[in-house]
């Protein structure tokens, strides 16, 4: 784990799901050496939300959604794509935030022990020259194995990071390899209806970062 990244507290997740979904934008998702800045989220809240997996009650699959907050909820869709969610709200109330998109900004090499050769370069002039723009992949820089890409869609995100069903029910709080961290990055976002569903389509529970992210303002 990069020593500058500190996992969010359980209290962060144990709140109103829409607040959590909004405040996750701009947060860093760290997974086994890969780092991403979250840019799109959706809320799924309670048994009264027809699009929520818990709408039909507590099952073996949805048990994790009933708490405690701050755990991962990973499931398979269409028999081929994994989706990553973070459990929210208080114990006993089923809710989660779906992570729909992110900017992947580094590979495992950036978090090696030898920060004098890698990490320090990212926080110096190299990082100041890197801009992440909408719908653009920038594959080569003068830092070894650095990749920058925008990932749209929860299935693509999990595929790129390597997240699968084995990463379901993971505690994101007491973890060095899978967690979310705050780097004080505030990003403008728009609010829309959720997509890819057939029920509860009227709810404005999708949050999407509206502007490109400028790495000149990021330090971690």
UniProtKB/Swiss-Prot annotation:
One of its GO terms (molecular function) is DNA binding. The keyword DNA repair applies. SUPFAM superfamilies: FMT C-terminal domain-like. Its EC number is 3.2.2.-. It comes from the Bacteria. It is an enzyme of class 3 (hydrolase). The keyword Hydrolase applies. Pfam families: Pur_DNA_glyco. Keywords: DNA damage, DNA repair, Hydrolase. GO terms for biological process: base-excision repair. InterPro entries: Formyl_transferase-like_C_sf, MPG, MPG_sf, RPE5. PANTHER family: DNA-3-METHYLADENINE GLYCOSYLASE. Belongs to the DNA glycosylase MPG family. This is Putative 3-methyladenine DNA glycosylase. It comes from Rickettsia bellii (strain OSU 85-389).
């Amino acid at each position: 784990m990069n020593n500058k990244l500190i996992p969010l507290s359980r209290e962060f997740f144990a709140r109103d799901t829409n607040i959590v979904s909004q405040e996750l934008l701009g947060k860093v998702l760290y997974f086994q050496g890969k780092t991403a800045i979250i840019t799109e989220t959706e809320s799924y809240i309670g048994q009264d939300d027809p699009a929520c997996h818990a709408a039909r009650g507590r099952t073996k699959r949805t048990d994790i959604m009933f708490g405690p907050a701050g755990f991962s909820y990973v499931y398979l869709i269409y028999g081929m794509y994994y989706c990553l969610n973070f459990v929210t709200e208080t114990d006993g109330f089923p809710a989660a935030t779906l992570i729909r998109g992110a900017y992947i900004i580094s590979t495992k090499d950036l978090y090696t022990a030898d920060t004098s050769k890698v990490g320090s370069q990212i926080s110096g002039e190299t990082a100041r020259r890197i801009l992440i723009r909408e719908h653009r992949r920038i594959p080569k820089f003068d830092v070894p194995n650095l990749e920058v890409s925008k990932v749209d869609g929860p299935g693509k995100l999990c595929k790129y990071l390597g997240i699968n069903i084995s990463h379901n029910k993971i505690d994101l709080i007491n973890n060095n390899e899978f967690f979310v961290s705050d780097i004080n990055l505030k990003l403008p976002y728009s609010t829309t209806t959720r997509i890819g569903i057939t029920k509860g389509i009227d709810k404005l529970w999708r949050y999407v970062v509206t502007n490109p992210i400028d790495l000149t303002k990021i330090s971690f």
